Amino acid sequence: MSPVEITGADAVVTPPMRGRVPLPPPPPPPMRRSAPSPPPMSGRVPPPPPPPPMFDPKGAGRVICCLRPGQNKSSLKRFQCGKLTNAWEELQRHGEAQTAPEFDLSEIEALFSAAVQNQADKSGSRREAFEANPDKLQLISGADALVPLPPPPPPMPRRSPPPPPPRFDAFDHKGARMVCGFRCPVTKRSSLKPLHWVKITRALQGSLWDELQIQYGESQTAIELDVPEIETLFSVGAKPRPKPKPEKVPLIDLKRANNTIVNLKILKMPLPDMMAAVMAMDESVLDVDQIENLIQLCPTKEEMELLKNYTGDKATLGKSEQCLLELMKVPRFEAKLRVLSFKIPFGTKITKFRKMLNVVNSACEEVRSSQMLKEIMKIILFLGNTLNQGTARGSAVGFRLDSLLILSETRADNNKMTLMHYLCKVLASKAADLLDFHKDLQSLESTLEINLKSLAEEIHAITKGLEKLKQELTASETDGPVSQVFRKLLKDFISSAETQVATVSTLYSSARINADALAHYFGEDPNHYPFEKVSATLLSFIRLFKKAHQENVKQEDLEKKKAATEDVFGGPDHNIDSDTSLDDSEAKSPSRIRPPPSIPRPPSRPRYACCRIPAVNPPPRLVCGPYPLPRLVRVGSPSPPPPSMSGGAPPPPPPPPMLVASRTAPPPHLSHVRSIPFQTRLVMGTSPLPLLVREGAPPPTLPSMSGGAPPPPPPLPMLRYQ
């Protein structure tokens, strides 16, 4: 067909139509107030008419699924996706149908077949059909007549291939939904562990993901991965359902069962191993505490009858019942445990009993054979009769043992000494060797922890234990092979234990006799004054005797030091306290210096002598004046007037005192004062430190403070008398 040529102002050159549908002529121009004409459709199929409303204006009718004629309803599960009506514009523009990969429909039907729904779920199916296919719904009013959709438009004629696809965009132009730019093979998805990453839904321009889309587009090839290996490593297999545990059959009390389990945990050893150690009487595997726990595990007679009468499956019993059944395999297992509990500490107990009984025998022998203790008791008897002479307590032939402790409670008139101190003083002056009488009683100290009555009870318990062991030996003869080794070991142990118990029993009898004899030795009744009380009284007397002797020694040392001090100052009449007549606070002041006692020195060394000024009557006293040093003022005289604070210049302070040692003979009125070494007299001087002058040497010249001639000697100390 040749193109139509139109001349004039409205002439339009129309290109030749190759393979296109001829366009209709343009409509006339719209009239005023008339409806706008539809836009020209160039090369497109006219769109189908809009679907009728889903419901009629009155709200009547129902929604049904409308299918195209000749198309069967699918029996597969619905794919709930959002349908786009304006997508694939490029493909529709060029008129090519979309090519889809080939699918295995049988596999899809096997995987996604819909189950047959009951009548109650029909409404749900209709609702799902309405939500899934909104464009295949039509309003039905009145009769149940099916209103089909208009027929589809005719296919577009074929033409040249479409242009290359545009650059991938994570969203379409309208932002309706996310579009994946990677084409993945459609395979059966295995249940793998998900990778919890943060997904990017849109590739930003210039990013790595944008470059990958530009470079590869939909033809991106991934690295070859071993998919079976990934499925093996990261598969989420269905967790096997735990097999239901068989219900345990409780036969014993719940509290008893809990205690049994707790004791098993404390033992920390398999029960069969412990039972084997018990049958072998192995002391290295179990101790006494573990054996006691095992004894608590042993079943009682009622529990044994209950377990024996149980006819059900033994595996359904609880852990505590299983433990009791294991213990019941050995006949009289509790009795065998008690045998081992008796055997383990037996050797230690026998050794301890022998040691204690030997100590008792030694202590009794030492007390009865001590001659020094006998002499001390004789002196105490004589001293008591002296104090009680002429009274009802006098002329005693002896005294009770408790009276030894009263010596430290009887005090002298000055309350500085007790009768125990006097006894030690007499012994120290007349018989010093008796002060160490306690050295003859070395074993007495070890008897404090011994009680013969408790010892007798323990020995009796051991004897009873041996009788029970003999009974178990007789009963184990009928146990059979399970107790053969145990029976042989028990027989040997009983034979050895009987010999040791007999020895200890004989030793105890000897100790008992010696203890009673010791009480008789002091005139006491053994029933009222047992051995424990005798030993405790003697030990208390020894402790008080030592304490009194130590106090006497300290007092004697103090008296010697005091006597030496009085000898230095010429007797008690000329002590410092009486000479100065100071107050008590001044007399007790640490500033009062007492000269040390005389110390002999080699004759080659020079000796220094000084004289001491005796006290005058009335003695002077120290008073506090305005001077930096105290002054000696006679008692009763007024204190010197203080210097004027507002008048002329105050008098100069006196120079500090100087201690000078002089060998000159004392004046006639002081001839009775002895000269002793290291004694000084107080003189006034200008030197701040005392000077010691050697005998025969001239007195030293005082140092000059200004470099000129030395100052004249200072005056004597100021002593004023009334």
Swiss-Prot record:
Pfam families in the cross-refs: FH2
Residues covered by region (Disordered): 1-56, 564-606, 635-672, 690-722
Skewed-composition ranges (Pro residues): 22-55, 593-605, 638-658, 709-722
Domain FH2: start-end pairs: 182-571
InterPro entries xrefs: FH2_Formin (IPR015425), FH2_Formin_sf (IPR042201), Formin_homology_domain (IPR051144)
Gene3D superfamilies in alphabetical order: Formin, FH2 domain (1.20.58.2220)
GO molecular function terms attached to this record: actin binding
Similarity comment text for this entry: Belongs to the formin-like family. Class-II subfamily.
Protein name (Swiss-Prot/TrEMBL): Formin-like protein 16
